[in-house]
From Swiss-Prot:
Transaldolase is important for the balance of metabolites in the pentose-phosphate pathway. The gene is tal. Keywords: Cytoplasm, Pentose shunt, Schiff base, Transferase. This is Probable transaldolase. GO terms for cellular component: cytoplasm.
Length: 215
C-alpha cells in the first residue's frame, strides 16, 4: 500500500517527503484555506516538492464550472489530479475530463455503489471516507473492503484511496482491506513512525554504547 499525505502545509509536506515514504499529496479547499495563501501558489509549491500525484479540488457545483476549473488546474503541473465530489454534476465532469485525458480523484464517497459509479465515469482514483463513516456509526472499513472486492472481481483499473484516516489503526486496516493507497494527515504519519518500544530500544542501545565506547 502506498501513502499520500493529506495536507496543504508546505513544512509538513517537506518533512514527510524527506522520510521517503510518500508517493503523492491530497489537498482540499479547507486544508488550503487554513494556510491563508493563494491556492495556485500552494499547489505549485507542492508540485515542486513531491514527485507524484497531487490532488487539487474544484469548488464549482455544476459540471461546466468543474470542467473549466479542472482544465485550468491541470495546466499548473503534469502531476495535478483533479479532485471532484461525488454527485451527478461531478460524474458528468469526470466523464468529460477522462475523455480529455485529465486525471481525476472522485472524493466524498460513502458507499461502494458511489465508488463503482465514479469508476465507470472514468475516475483515475476514488476516495472513500472511512473516518466520516465511523463518525455516524457506520463501519467505514466495511465500505472500503466492499469496494476493493468489487474492483478486484471486475478488473477495474481505478485506484482506491482510503481517505478520512483518523489514526494508525485505520492505516493497518486499510492495508489489510487491500486498498492500494491511503492518504494520511501528517499527525497520523508521524504516529506510524513512533512506537514506545522503539524509543526505549534506541535509548538502551545508546546507554549500552556509552558504557563501552571508551574501553
Amino acid at each position: 500500500m502506498r501513502f499520500f499525505l493529506d495536507s496543504a502545509n508546505i513544512d509538513e509536506i517537506r518533512e514527510a517527503n524527506r522520510l521517503g515514504v510518500i508517493s503523492g499529496v491530497t489537498t482540499n479547499p479547507s486544508l488550503i484555506a487554513k494556510e491563508g495563501r493563494n491556492f495556485r501558489e500552494v499547489v505549485q509549491e507542492i508540485a515542486a516538492i513531491v514527485d507524484g500525484p497531487i490532488s487539487a479540488e474544484v469548488i464549482s457545483t455544476d459540471a461546466e464550472g468543474m470542467i473549466a476549473e479542472a482544465r485550468e488546474l491541470a495546466k499548473i503541473h503534469p502531476n495535478i489530479v483533479i479532485k471532484i465530489p461525488l454527485c451527478a454534476a461531478g460524474l458528468s465532469a469526470t466523464a468529460r475530463l477522462a475523455q480529455e485525458g485529465i486525471r481525476t480523484n472522485v472524493t466524498l464517497i460513502f458507499s461502494a455503489n458511489q465508488g463503482l459509479l465514479a469508476a465507470n465515469a472514468g475516475a483515475t482514483y476514488v476516495s472513500p471516507f472511512v473516518g466520516r463513516l465511523d463518525d455516524i456509526g457506520h463501519d467505514g472499513m466495511d465500505v472500503l473492503r466492499e469496494l476493493v472486492e468489487i474492483f478486484d472481481i471486475h478488473g477495474i483499473a481505478t485506484e482506491i484511496i482510503a481517505a478520512s484516516i483518523r489514526h494508525p489503526v485505520h492505516v493497518s486496516a486499510a492495508a489489510r482491506a487491500g486498498a492500494p493507497i491511503a492518504t494520511v494527515p501528517f499527525k497520523v504519519l508521524m504516529q506510524l513512525v513512533k512506537h514506545p518500544l522503539t524509543d526505549l530500544g534506541i535509548e538502551r542501545f545508546l546507554k549500552d554504547w556509552e558504557s563501552v565506547k571508551d574501553k
